[in-house]
Amino acid sequence: MKLSMNMEYLVARLGNEKAASLVAEAGFDCVDYSLMDMINGDCVFNGADYIAEAQKVGRIFRDYGVPVRQAHAPFRFKDYEDPVAFRDHIFPTIARSVEAAAAMGAPIIVVHPLHYTDTSTPEEIFQRNMKFYNDLLPVCKACGIQVAVENMFRRDQRRGHIIHDSCSRAEEFCRYVDALDSEYFVACLDVGHVGLPVQEDEAWDFVYKLGHNRLKSLHIHDNDYKNDQHGVPYSGKIDWDKVTKALGQIDYTGDFTYEISMTGVIGQMEPELYPAALRYIHDIGRALVAKTEEYRVKSE
């Protein structure tokens, strides 16, 4: 199993070349490249040469021995519920991000489902998401890349606490992947998101329920079950022995991909200390990969 580091913070701070160098020196196998900057009009991936720019990024990371193995589509758009904005701007940008990820060499890109709203039922959102993802299918086929659906959460606007959202329940998550019914759609389990809405299921329960055939991607991070902290494993309350046991027992074959908030790790740290911080993150991840391998049971 490959150990992958999320790159959004490091690339924004240091640029692609230096970020790739540091992650390679820390011992990671590959990276998850964020395309979040595409919400900004001046992002290079919004320009006419976006494929060439993406290919350049892919070459940089490959040359350092840490290829882009996963990407993340942009999602911090305004006006998701405005059908005109979604049709004319949001969807085309997400589709372009899929093309850019493929040009980098990523075999998979995580694309958030549309969220629940206060005025729509879960079934209505399910139907909208089926159209949304299926509209991406021609792009996936043309580029040879898989889209991973992620489990989400949201906050109650009146009370401020976390509540359920698209794919936040294991049964609904499985339904999404099964209904899409294509080799181009898989599940990305965000381990930290599972425990935020109130429910009995834990992250390892999701692993077992999604199973070997659906689960092909991860977002690895920790929290206190109250806030989406994106901490380093063991900094919160998630039981990592149970997570790794479940991954091994379903014979998970994807990457072990971090989605850590680097501001929480690095903070005001001087750049010369970044290598030490990355080695710390790497060593924990490598230990969790080893635990997963110890538990691995080959699927038939």
Question: Where do the protein language model's features map onto the residues?
Answer:
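Glycine-rich, proline-tolerant flexible connector loops at the mouths of alpha/beta enzymes
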Residues: S34-G58, T119
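Histidine-acidic metal/acid-base catalytic patches
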Residues: M1-S4, Y9-D29, R62, F91, ...
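Short beta-strand segments at enzyme active-site cores
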Residues: D32-Y33, V68-A73, A106-P113, V147-N151, ...
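Active-site-proximal loop/turn and secondary-structure-junction residues that shape catalytic pockets
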Residues: Y9-V11, L35-D37, P74-F77, P113-T117, ...
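Aromatic/hydrophobic pocket-lining residues that form π-stacking "cages" and hydrophobic walls in ligand
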Residues: A19, V57, S97, L136, ...
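Active-site acidic/histidine proton-transfer and metal-coordination neighborhood
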Residues: I60-Y64, K78-V186, L196-V198, E272, ...
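Short glycine-enriched, charge-decorated loop/helix-capping segments at active-site entrances
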Residues: C43-A48, V84-R87, I162-I163, H230-S235
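Short Asp/Glu-rich motifs
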Residues: D42-C43, Y80-E81, S120-T121, R159, ...
